[in-house]
Each structure stands twice: as C-alpha cells, then as structure tokens.
C-alpha cells in the first residue's frame, strides 16, 4: 500500500503506484479538472508523475504561485510551438519564466515584425484551443543530441551536449512540437488561456556578445482574464509614469551615449536631488550618525582582503598607476572600516554610526541598464553601525522606525518586510546567528511589522532585513536593507577595547534607507507620475502676468515669495512672455508645477493673486500672505 498525505493531514491509500492526476481524481472531479501539477515536499512535478512510495502531496492549481509558474513555463513552450508552425526555418533555443511572464529566444533569418507577433499570438490561441496533451519522455543524452541535430535544431543540440554524458534528459511534446525541458508542464494546452505577447528584443546566444544575436520574444501569462487585464492596465499606467519619459519632458536629466549608465543632471533635476540628499543628511544628523567621506579609488589589496577582487572583479572598474592596481569602489563598507580603525576605539564608543553619500561604480552590462534606475555610477545613503551583539536589537528597532518615517515623508505607506536567515555555508557561531536573527525579528515585532521569513537567503556573513516599497500601481521596489556582518570586521582586522580590557571584534551593521539616490529618485518620479510633492518639486510656484502692465508686480511677488519662509526660499519662476494667459497656464501645468499664480489688473490693484493648484484646481483670489501660509503648510506636511 502507498499512503499519500494531503495538506490537511488526511491520508489516502492506494494499492500500488499512483499518478498525481489519479490522486486528484480520487479527491474530486473539480480538483482533477483544475490540477496543473503536484507538489511532493518542495518538488513540483507533472500530473502524470508516478508516486511509488509514501509521500506528502499537494495538488497545484492556477490559484497557487507554483501553478502560475507552470502556466508561464508552458506558455513559453506554446510560443515556440506556434513560431515553428508559422516559421519552420526558425531555430528554438531557451525559454525561461521571468517576473510576470516569460521569454523565448529564436534564431531566424529576419527580425520578427509587430505583424508577426500578432500572427504568432493568434496561432498560440488556436493551438491552446486544440487542448493537445503535453507528454513527457526521457532520452539518454547522446540520443537526445542526435535527435535534435536530426531536426536541424543545433542550439538545442549544443545545450544538451553540455550536459554530462551519463545523464538522461527529458523532452515534452505537444502536437507536432517537442522541446527539451526539465518541466513540469500543464497536462494539456487547453489550460493555457490568458496570455499576451509583449515585445521583441535582441539577445546574444548564451549572453556572449561574440555570439549570434537572437530574437527574444517576451510574453505574459496569467491564471485568469481579470489578472491579465489588471497587469496590462498596470503596464499602461507604468508607461505613462516612466521616469525616462518624464525626466525628458520635465527637463530633469538625460543619459548620454558618451557615458552610458551615468546621469547628467539638469538644473531642475539637481534641485530635486539636493532636496532628497539634504533631507537624508538631516536624518543622519538627527539620529546620531557622523557623516564621513571616503575616496572613490582604492588599492586592489584592500579588495583582496574583503573578497571582492576574487568574487566581484568583473563588475568593478579597474585602473593601474605606477605598477599598482586600483578599483573604483563598488560599495562604501571597506572605507568605513578603515576610518573606524584610525585610533583606538573603546566599548564606550559603541554603537558608532557612520553615514556617507558615497559615490560607487559597478560595471553593469549595457543590456541591463535602465534610465536612472539601473546605472553604473550611483550614490548611496550608506550607513554602517559598529556595535556589539547586544546592541543589534536596539539599533535595528530604531532603524526600522526611522525608515518608516522617511518612507512616509516621501509618500510611501506600504512596506513589505522580509528576514533572510542563515544559509548552509556561513561563518560565525550558531550562537551568534541565533542572537542576530532573533534581534532582527524582535526589532520588527517591536515596530509592529508583519514580516516574511526567507530561510537560507541570508549572506554567508550574516542575516538581514529587506524593506520593499509597494508603489501606487502595485509594483515592488526593494530599497532599504539592514544587514548584519560578522565577516568584514574580521577580514579587515577591526577591533575595540572591551570592558575587560581585551581586544574584541565589533559587529558591523550595513544599512541603507533609500539605497541608490538615482534609483530612488526614479521611483519617486514614477510613484508621483512626475507631480512631485511641494517640498520636492524643483519649481514650486510660477508667477504669470496677463499683460505687460503687471510685469513689475509679478517680479515683486516672486521676490517676496523667495524670502517668505525662514531658512527656506521658495523655488519660484516668473513667466512674463507676451503670450496668451491660457497658453502660459497650460505650459506650466504640463510641467506639473504645484502652484500657478496669475496677476491681472484686478489682482494688482488688490495686492493679491489668483491661485491655481495642480490638477487644474482654481483656488480663487487670495492675498500673498494667505498663499504663503498655504504653501508653508504643504511643505511642512510633506504633501
């Protein structure tokens, strides 16, 4: 007898080997129809998988995350099936699942056109409607190589040839198409109903620029029609909010071909940058951080000690001078330890908090660059806390509360918390890991946060908390981090004198709130669709005249506004052009300015202004003092 244990703890007995599909059918016809795969322990398997021993089993349906993964994987194969039907000369390569979808790479004699994509998607729908069974078979490696060579699929043959000779490989067939794959897959093509092809891009075979350029077709697939429509709507909204488009339209920044992956900030964009940086500088100052500044170029011997030269060298920009090798720093941490090591530190000095707006460089591949979100040169609000194990809980609790306040001030209220715990390969004692993991979790509980645990996802040198923002259209951005580090102080020989008079290693806490300022500003632009809160807006007020008769009055208003607030000048422009007032209002509205002040003869005579708020809201005529009170309240409340 074989005993199958279901998720609710109940058991079912079978006389002999049984498939996942048969177990599902024994539970109910509805479940049998909905079954996409099975999960035995942590392994997801086909519904045709035969269970030969006592096992725990859950039936995977479209409602499960694993089910969605199977749908997307299978839809990638359906895409390849459709391409081979329409373009028999095309060669198939690989087709993995990615976030929110999948892609498949093809080798073909000409680029696919938008019309081709529409035809491929239509053919996919037709093949899905046939509800053809998806059948798995296993071949010895050499036989599989010969099989795909016989089909003229040289890329597939090359992939299989790289597999050890003693391994078998699995193939999946649907209709007239068969593909190499580990699986699992849906039981039939009829399970694939809600998908859309998105775009075509270039991709080098095996990611190597020396190889052939392939065509990568991207698609998305979902469990329901509603989810697909929601996703497509989110993409439409994201396109409107694209920081690259808004950065150009609002004259904030540009990326130039003369320096790929680095940002040229325009005056208005640099004003926004300065507002973010100066705000974070006040956060440092008000929370016990000492701001420091380290050099950008450091000798390779330092990077050898930290392990970066061995593990991360390909992502570092290097140079040579006087027979010494140097690297542009990809991170600030080693520099902060070198500062910590200057002079003797006592336990009374701990916790010691350093903060730096450190400029870092990482040699990201060109294909991975994305506006100001993914760059090669960036500045971090990088902080490091040197402390003892006993300090970790209090420091993490204070940091989480601070992070929540900062995110709220920037307009983010939805934060996802995740604790990444010890991996198998790690340094440090179990006692130290127990203490650190407990401190991270307790700090989140003390802050009233619900959190996920990601077992084994911590770094080899310590556990961490990841803080992820959820934006206005549901996208997630991992920005904040609190990383415990037992390793780097050891590698770089950092010490403090303990209460016992002996030498001790400090624990190092790596922390960032906004992370890369470039990326965070990109997130801000997209979160607010360019309509930044008043306190961040590069231009807060535009003063417009109706006729030349109000020019001097408008200049007078602008001058008063620039001096209206103590310790803070309002950012004001005047527009005195001889243009229709409706034209000028529209132009400044498109720049998403918080306020537009209009002055005609009536306003001039009354010593007042007509106020228009963003979103075409007419607030009527008010005195200049009343307007100053209004905008001061906006700035103070960070709206």
UniProtKB/Swiss-Prot annotation:
CDD domains: TGS_ThrRS, ThrRS_anticodon, ThrRS_core. Keywords: Aminoacyl-tRNA synthetase, ATP-binding, Cytoplasm, Ligase, Metal-binding, Nucleotide-binding, Protein biosynthesis, RNA-binding, tRNA-binding, Zinc. One of its GO terms (biological process) is threonyl-tRNA aminoacylation. Zn(2+) binds at residues 333, 384, 510. GO terms for cellular component: cytosol. Its cofactor is Zn(2+). Residues 242-533 are annotated as: Catalytic. It is an enzyme of class 6 (ligase). HAMAP family: Thr_tRNA_synth. NCBIfam families: thrS (TIGR00418). Catalyzes the attachment of threonine to tRNA(Thr) in a two-step reaction: L-threonine is first activated by ATP to form Thr-AMP and then transferred to the acceptor end of tRNA(Thr). Also edits incorrectly charged L-seryl-tRNA(Thr). This is Threonine--tRNA ligase. It comes from Acidovorax ebreus (strain TPSY). The gene is thrS.
């Amino acid at each position: 007898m074989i005993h199958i244990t279901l998720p609710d703890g109940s058991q079912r007995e079978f006389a002999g080997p049984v498939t996942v599909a048969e177990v599902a059918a024994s539970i109910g016809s509805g479940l049998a129809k909905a079954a996409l795969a099975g999960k035995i322990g942590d392994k997801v398997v086909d519904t045709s998988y035969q269970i030969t021993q006592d096992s725990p089993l859950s039936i995977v349906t479209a409602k499960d995350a694993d089910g969605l993964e199977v749908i997307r994987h299978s839809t990638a194969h359906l895409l390849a099936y459709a391409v081979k039907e329409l373009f028999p000369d095309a060669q198939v390569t690989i087709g993995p699942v990615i976030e929110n979808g999948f892609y498949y790479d093809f080798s073909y004699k000409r680029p696919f056109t938008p019309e081709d994509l529409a035809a491929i998607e239509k053919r996919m729908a037709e093949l899905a409607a046939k509800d053809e069974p998806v059948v798995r078979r296993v071949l010895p490696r050499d036989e599989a190589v010969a099989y795909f060579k016989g089909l003229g699929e040289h890329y597939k043959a090359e992939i299989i040839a790289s597999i050890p000779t003693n391994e078998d490989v699995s193939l999946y067939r649907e209709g007239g198409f068969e593909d190499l794959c580990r699986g699992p897959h849906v039981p039939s093509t009829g399970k694939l109903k809600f998908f859309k092809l998105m775009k075509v891009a270039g991709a080098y075979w095996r990611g190597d620029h020396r190889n052939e350029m392939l065509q990568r077709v991207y698609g998305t697939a979902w469990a329901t029609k509603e989810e697909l429509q929601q996703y497509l709507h989110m993409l439409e909204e994201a396109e409107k909010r694209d920081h690259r488009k808004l950065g150009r339209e609002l004259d904030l920044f540009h990326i130039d071909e003369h320096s790929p992956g680095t940002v040229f900030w325009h005056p208005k964009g640099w004003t926004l940058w300065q507002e973010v940086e100066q705000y974070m500088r006040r956060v440092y100052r008000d929370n016990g951080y000492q701001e420091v500044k380290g050099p950008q170029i450091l000798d390779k011997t330092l990077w050898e000690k930290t392990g970066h030269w061995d593990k991360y060298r390909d992502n570092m920009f290097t140079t040579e001078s006087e027979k010494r090798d140097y690297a542009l720093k990809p991170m600030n941490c080693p520099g902060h330890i070198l500062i910590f090591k200057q002079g003797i530190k006592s336990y009374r000095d701990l916790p010691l908090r350093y903060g730096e707006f450190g400029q870092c460089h990482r040699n990201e591949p060109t294909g991975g660059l994305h506006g100001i979100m993914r760059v090669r040169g960036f500045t971090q609000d990088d902080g490091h806390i040197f402390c003892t194990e006993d300090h970790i809980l209090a420091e993490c609790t204070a940091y989480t509360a601070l992070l929540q306040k900062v995110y709220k001030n920037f307009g983010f209220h939805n934060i996802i918390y995740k604790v990444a715990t010890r991996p198998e390969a790690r340094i440090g004692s179990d006692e130290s890991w127990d203490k650190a993991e407990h401190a991270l979790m307790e700090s989140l509980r003390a802050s009233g946060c619900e959190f996920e645990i990601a077992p084994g996802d911590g770094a080899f040198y310590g556990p961490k908390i990841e803080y992820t923002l959820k934006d206005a259209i549901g996208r997630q951005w991992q920005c904040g981090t609190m990383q415990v580090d037992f390793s780097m102080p050891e590698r770089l020989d950092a010490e403090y004198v303990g209460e016992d008079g002996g030498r001790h290693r400090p624990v190092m806490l790596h922390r960032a709130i906004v992370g890369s300022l470039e990326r965070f500003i990109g997130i801000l632009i997209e979160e607010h669709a360019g309509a930044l809160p008043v306190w961040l807006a590069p231009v807060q007020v535009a003063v417009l005249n109706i006729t030349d008769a109000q020019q001097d009055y408008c200049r007078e208003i602008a001058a008063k506004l620039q001096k209206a607030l103590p310790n803070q000048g309002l950012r004001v422009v005047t527009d005195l052009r001889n243009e229709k007032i409706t034209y000028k209002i529209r132009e400044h509205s498109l720049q998403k300015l918080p306020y537009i002040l209009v002055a005609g003869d009536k306003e001039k005579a009354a010593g007042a202004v007509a106020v228009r708020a963003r979103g075409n809201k007419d607030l009527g005529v008010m005195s200049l003092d009343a307007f100053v009170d209004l905008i001061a309240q906006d700035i103070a409340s960070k709206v």
